[in-house]
Amino acid sequence: MWTLEDFVRESNRIEGILRDPTEDEIVAHKLLRALPQIAVSDLEIFVAVVQPGAQLRRQLGWDVRVGNHIAPPGGPIIEAQLGDLLAGDLSAYKKHCVYETLHPFTDGNGRSGRALWLWQMGGEAPIGFLHQFYYQTLDALRQ
């Protein structure tokens, strides 16, 4: 069984952050994981810890590109779409994919998306994020 610290460490390493998780990062994950529901404001608080200075892309012109992916344009619709996504009844896999496609923040989307996935998994990542997500992806493709 992976500890929360293991999960945060792996999530950070995916982003090229090779240091151990900070206490603030661990606490932010614990607080998010303990919520009965996650609202946009909860993710804003989380992202402020894991990526200080990053903001929800609610302003026109706050556009992002990640590799070949161009996220939807920034503006008020991003907040509405994120709220709808959080309220929706999607699988952890599907919600994570839609979240990463939306890319709602100026930075910190990968780590916040993985934290959201962990929350949807009931706070447990028994065999690690990448392994579990890999099999969820295969299952989704087979449906």
Name each region found by the language model.
Residues 1-143:
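FIC/Doc superfamily catalytic core
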